[in-house]
Swiss-Prot record:
Gene symbol of the encoding locus: rpsU
Name of the protein this chain belongs to: Small ribosomal subunit protein bS21
Keywords: Ribonucleoprotein, Ribosomal protein
InterPro entries: Ribosomal_bS21, Ribosomal_bS21_CS, Ribosomal_bS21_sf
Region of interest (Disordered), residue spans: 48-71
Classification of source organism: Bacteria, Pseudomonadati, Pseudomonadota, Gammaproteobacteria, Aeromonadales
Biological processes annotated in GO: translation
Gene3D superfamilies in the record: Ribosomal protein S8
GO CC, alphabetical: ribonucleoprotein complex; ribosome
Length: 71
């Protein structure tokens, strides 16, 4: 859990914004959302594999676009 020390004469809005930013960097909300419901291990592996395939296809598309620009 991220901890924020409120500085002297610091407005509440600014401290809240810093806290939200640190929570986002730590990945607290995404972790809570992923643990909200039980997910079977096979589903986790399937989703991870699908995201890896998607990343790979995106990388290939980027490389092909770069090659097409060169010629």
């Amino acid at each position: 859990m991220p901890v924020i020390k409120v500085r002297e004469n610091e407005p509440f809005d600014v401290a809240l914004r810093r806290f939200k930013r640190s929570c986002e960097k730590a990945g607290v909300l995404s972790d809570v959302r992923s643990r909200e419901f039980y997910e079977k291990p096979t589903t986790i592996r399937k989703r991870a594999k699908a995201s890896a395939v998607k990343r790979h296809m995106k990388k290939l598309a980027r490389e092909n676009a770069r090659r097409n620009r060169l010629y």
